[in-house]
């Protein structure tokens, strides 16, 4: 079944995702930054050789985009990440264009987004969070759920949605 395959390829035995107690999804989760800092500094969290925690604090929000070649809109997940997100999820790799710049209103689009939504091609602009965001790259994640997301700088996305809190810690 396609849904089971997607869920299996999105997760990993090598990391865990922390959400708020009773949150049924990343979107419903709210973690304050202080709690996230406590989590990433726990001794169970793997570390880079320089001692930094191997973790990614993330904001996950839903936006609406116009469908490509059809009428109507549909929900798309936007994920604000830290640099470690790419080491924690090695299946996510840029296949076209380039990585977004940290501190910029730029995003990379999952391969599944580019064929289904308007404005999701390299060089195009997507409006969300009260601003225009430039799509600078396309990524593939081996058919995982991430292929249906837009990714950008955690701080830029949190700022655009006026989010002082986080959604998850991976």
Predicted regions: what is each one?
Residues 1-77, 96-98, 103:
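Hydrophobic, regular-secondary-structure patches
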Residues 10, 46-49, 55, 66-73, ...:
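Mechanotransmission and gating elements of multispan inner-membrane complexes involved in transport
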Residues 17, 106, 168-170:
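Short aromatic/hydrophobic contact patches that present stacked aromatics
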Residues 19-20, 31, 80-81, 108-109, ...:
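A conserved hydrophobic position in a structured secondary element of the catalytic/binding core
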Residues 24, 61-63, 83-86, 141:
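Active-site/binding-pocket entry motifs
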Residues 74-116:
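Short beta-strand boundary microenvironments
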